[in-house]
């Protein structure tokens, strides 16, 4: 357990310092060694996103959401990755899921409203955002 914390925490520190390349290396190792660590996958996905590796970010964040499906933060970040990858419909569903889990999650609400306003034809007229 201590090894897990040290390994994942090291990757998180590197990420927060903006050293995304090193963070990816540490977090990839942590995610292989500790496949049940949602934190390793969340930060790995975020580091990939910072590198512009949006498909890799989606994969890591999807794994994080499988481990911890009730996290609105993970669904919001997954929505951000889908949006950056040019997959707005999936982004919309992830933002919506984040709001279902936490109706007061302002970032997810703002992202959902923004996406809905920018892409009305793609998303269809039946999509509603609760006020």
Regions found by a protein language model. Name each.
Residues 66-86:
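Mid-chain, well-packed structural core segment of small domains
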Residues 16-29, 50-63, 84-97, 119-131:
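Structural signature of tandem alpha-helical TPR/SEL1-like repeats
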């Amino acid at each position: 357990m201590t090894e897990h914390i040290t390994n994942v925490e090291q990757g998180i520190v590197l990420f927060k310092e903006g050293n995304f390349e090193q963070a990816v290396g540490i977090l990839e190792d942590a995610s292989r060694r500790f496949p049940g660590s949602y934190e390793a996958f969340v930060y790995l996905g975020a580091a990939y996103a910072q590198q512009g590796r949006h498909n890799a970010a989606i994969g890591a964040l999807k794994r994080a959401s499988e481990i911890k499906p009730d996290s609105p933060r993970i669904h919001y970040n997954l929505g951000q990755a889908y949006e950056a990858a040019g997959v707005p419909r999936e982004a919309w569903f992830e933002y919506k899921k984040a709001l279902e889990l936490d109706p007061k999650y302002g970032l997810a609400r703002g992202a959902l409203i923004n996406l809905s306003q920018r892409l009305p034809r793609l998303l269809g007229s039946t999509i509603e955002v609760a006020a």
